[in-house]
Structures are given as structure tokens and as C-alpha cells.
Amino acid sequence: YTDSPDLAVSDWLKWTEDGDPYWTRFYAENSREMLYDWVIDLGVEWNRVAMGGFENSLPRFHFTEHGALDVVQALVRTVIGLPTVNFIWNKRVESILVDNSHVTGVEVMDVRTGETRTLKGEHIVIATGGFEGNLDKVLSNWIPDLPKPERLLIGASVHARGQGLDLASAAGAKISNLNRRYIYTNGIVNIRDPEGVMAVTAGNNDSMRVNTDGVRFTNEGGFDKNILKDMLSLGTATYWAIFDEPGRAGFAMRGAEWVNTPTDRHPLLDNPMITSKSMTLEELAELAGIPADRLVSSVARYNAMIDAGEDSDFNRFPEMNNIPPRIERAPFYAMQFYPMTRKSMGGVVIDADGRALNDSGQVVPGLYAIGEVTGSAGINGKHGMDGMFLGPAVVTGRVAGRTIVAAHAIRDEKIRIRTPAAEDPLPDPSSWVPTLTEDELGTLLTTSREGYWHFETSHEMVLERQYGCTQCHSAEVPFFPLNNRTSKSAQVELCSNCHGRQF
């Protein structure tokens, strides 16, 4: 097939309805050089390309073997190796400093000790992501013309709270379109979350979807923005995916650390807290709390349309090769789904150079924003596109970086780099041994400590998967933090022990 920037722009603007025309075209014309080729030079291997969502008339959604992990690892691995880049770990920005309308630095707090300090800089780049982990902020900036769901799950990072937006606004930046977001319709409750608000992304292409009345209500394979509208119009904004034993193989999920077994054999399918399971449809309906006669009738009609090769209700399978399997062989399954937050599509308004703008459209001197905190520069418009969040984050980041370098070049001056602290020495490999037992680690995890979220989450997985200490730790990565680039580089390579796993 033959693709072109013009065709990509046409496809994307049609889908998003009002995506930012400048950034849409810029991405179409420059993402090959600024993203695809660039990360290849950093060691990333693209291994397949797919259509992605319905927004593409040709395959454009590129994948690596382990997803975003491969790209993130390559970027972090590269930047850690740069002697001119300094890292300050476990700090949270409390405020952006402004002097005479110019941004001059940040006030930060150590999340473990509470100590504060000031960091000065002529150019401050906000790259804090969206706010889809903040339900209060999401619901107070809800999508116009769509009903608010009774129950909305969090499908974004627990750290996506929107602090970067608040910081930017306080520094004078304009914030827009906070009521635009990519809501997924396939969220199930994360059984590991005691509050029942965190989601896992799941789905089954071999299922049919019914509402609380047991009636099929949407084209399961249709446009996700149409499915969202159908789902939120249900009143209760929840549905059940109905499938049978052969259809169990169609189940898939992602987005949780504990997803570490082949999904068609995952115990979640046999967990009554998430999945109702029965030898008859009547009993299944009773377990799920939906009318039995309507569920039985809906399945019978669904099977009849499959036999006829025509979905006269929702046109799910207009072509014979897209026909899903019948639902007929016990045991039968019903899995309840809810809408879930995912990605922010509004945020800090920026210009073509990645500089933050104020309410008057003027540059906020010294302030930049990139990625999801800008709503991906408005590329996604009103309707999100697959693969169009990580990519624009990289591209807008590079745009801002080039702008900063150019600003110094115009003034014919070097960028001032703070002299890094002397590196800590690595332990002697010949004498290094693990010093923490499994019981001691378990005891350490019984109490949550401020600033140790990643430590606690990762080590809970260590105990669950029965990893030995040397799965991750060595003389290069000892049991205590080191200010040492060799150690940090070694840590980067360990991310795949938990993330991006393939089964």
C-alpha cells in the first residue's frame, strides 16, 4: 500500500472531528524522522504495524515486541548515559518560580524526607502527563453531551493526578479542553484494588454484549466512540460480555502487574467476584442479576443471525470472514464491564515551538509543555486515536528540546550544566551478597511508606512470583540507592522483569 502525509491528515482530522490542524500535519510529516527513525538509532526494533482503530484507512499503528517498554527503556538508557544530564530522584515539584513574568525555576520536595529545595533554570519543561487518575477532576470536567456514568473506573496511572496542569496554570499558562478524554468501554474491576476503583483493560472478541435487561445494545466490533455513546446512554453505564467455553479463548486483558499467565487460562475467568459462570444461560442470568428470559432470547437471536450470516440489529459482521462464533457450549460466562478513564486530550496550550501560552496567546517566557499534559497538542481532537499519545509525546518533547537549544544558539552561549555530584562507588562484586530475607521483605511491606510506591509495588510482585533477590539485584544494583550511572543503567534493563512481559 502507499501512504502519504496528506492521506494520514485526512484520516485523522475526519476521525477526531476537530484535531489541531497544525500539529496533526506536523506529526504526519515529521514523525518518521523524529520518532520512528530516531528510536531505531537508539536501539528500538519495530516488529509489526497494524490498522489500529477505525481512524486509519491504512496500517499505521506500529508495535515493538514489548510495547511502550521498549521505547521508554531506549530513551532512559540513552539519557542516563549522557554526562551532561543530571537526575534528582524522589522529588515532587511543589511550585514553579516566576520572577517578573519569567519562569526561573522550581521548588521541589523530597517525597521521602519532606525536605524542600529550590532548583533554578531558564527553561522549565512540564512533562507530567494527564489527570485520568483523578476521578474528581475527570468528573468535574466531563465530556459535553455525554451522560456521566454512575460508576467510572480509573484506567490510568495512579500518579496521573493533574498536578502539572495546576503548576502550569499558577505560572500563567492557559489550560484548555479538559473535558476531552479517551474513555475506554472495556474496564473490569481490578481485584487487587481494595477500594474497587482501579480498572484492568479486558475484552473478548468472541462475546456478545448485553445491558442490565439482558438485551444486546451495540455493535461489539463498531467504532469505540459509538460504543461509548451507546454504553453511557444505558443509564447504569455497565454491560455484560456473554460467551461460552470455546469463546473463553477470546478473552484478553492488560494493564495490571499481576497479569502474568496466558489470559485464556487466567483464574480471573473462574473468579465469581468478576465472572459469573454456569452450565445454563438461565442460571447465568440469575448469577449476573439480569432477566433470564431476555438473556436466553438475546443469545438465541444472536446465534440465529450468525447462522444467517447477517447481523440485522447492529451490522457487526457484514462480511462472512468477520462472523463471530455461536454461543452454545457450556459452561457459559458473564463478565461485567464499566467505562474507565484512560487518556487526557486537553491541557496546557502550546505554540509550534512547544512553549506554553497564556490566556492572551502570548508566550510564558521559560515555560514549555509536552506530551499528554498538553492533550497531545490537540492532535486527538474530540476522539482519541490508537497509538497517538506516546508518539506525540516524543515528538513534542523533541520540538521543545530543539527550541531550547536554538534559544541558546541565538544568544551564542553554552547551556549551563550544573556540575554533578561525585558518583558513589559500586560494591565489590566478589563480596556482594543478598542481605534481605523473604520474611524480612514481607515485614517491610506491611506498612506503606510515603515515597516508596514503586518499591512496594514491585516487591509485592517479587514475593508473589517467588523471584530470588538476584533476579534484579547484584553488585551493580545493590539493596540501597546509589548515585551512580552504571547502577542506574543496570536498573533500566530490569524493567522487563515486570513490564512488557510476553506469554
Map each language-model feature to its residues:
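Conserved N-terminal/central alpha/beta ligand/cofactor-binding core
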Residues: Y1-N86, N90, D136, R209, ...
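Helical element adjacent to the flavin cofactor pocket in flavoenzyme catalytic cores
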Residues: F63-E122, L165, S169-A171, V349
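A glycine-rich dinucleotide-binding beta-alpha-beta segment and adjacent secondary-structure elements
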Residues: S95, R294-A377
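Glycine-rich loop(s) and the adjacent beta-strand/alpha-helix scaffold that form part
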Residues: E115, L119-I188, G387-V399, T403
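An anion/pyrophosphate-binding glycine-rich loop and adjacent beta-alpha core
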Residues: L165-L167, A171-I290
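Helix-rich C-terminal "cap"/substrate-channel and partner-interaction subdomain
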Residues: T236-F332, A400-T403, A407-I410, K414-P427
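C-terminal structured subdomain/cap of oxidoreductase catalytic cores
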Residues: A249-W258, L268, G346-I410
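Sequence context of c-type cytochrome heme-c attachment sites
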Residues: E423-S489
